[in-house]
Amino acid sequence: NLMQFELLIMKVAGRSGIVWYSDYGCFCGKGGHGRPQDATDRCCFVHDCCYGKVTECDPKMDFYRYSSNNGDIVCEANNPCTKEICECDKAAAICFRDNKDTYDNKYWNIPMEGCQEESEPC
């Protein structure tokens, strides 16, 4: 669920998902249209695509289980659908961490008019 995603981002990337990623670029926080503006926005685009492939449960609401083993996140496999959600969130959190250096404040809270291009396929 979204609260778990926030906690996972904090654990992996060391920053708040709500503060840093809830309104960034064309895909972080608002659903998504257009083309990703940078590597961070692409993390959100890929995350949106990943959530789009989850059909048997609700990625924004359903609870999943994971553990941390020497800093690595391990999604539990008790329920295949919630494991999928966990894997989506884990990949995004790692992507945010790996692209911290490219984060650009100019993409924070950009007007949606800047996101009108046709979206690329997932």
From Swiss-Prot:
InterPro entries: PLipase_A2, PLipase_A2_Asp_AS, PLipase_A2_dom, PLipase_A2_dom_sf, PLipase_A2_His_AS. It is found in: Secreted. One of its GO terms (molecular function) is calcium-dependent phospholipase A2 activity. The keyword ATP-binding does not apply. CDD domains: PLA2c. Gene3D superfamilies: Phospholipase A2 domain. One of its GO terms (cellular component) is extracellular region. Belongs to the phospholipase A2 family. Group II subfamily. D49 sub-subfamily. PANTHER family: PHOSPHOLIPASE A2 FAMILY MEMBER, PHOSPHOLIPASE A2, MEMBRANE ASSOCIATED. This is Acidic phospholipase A2 5.
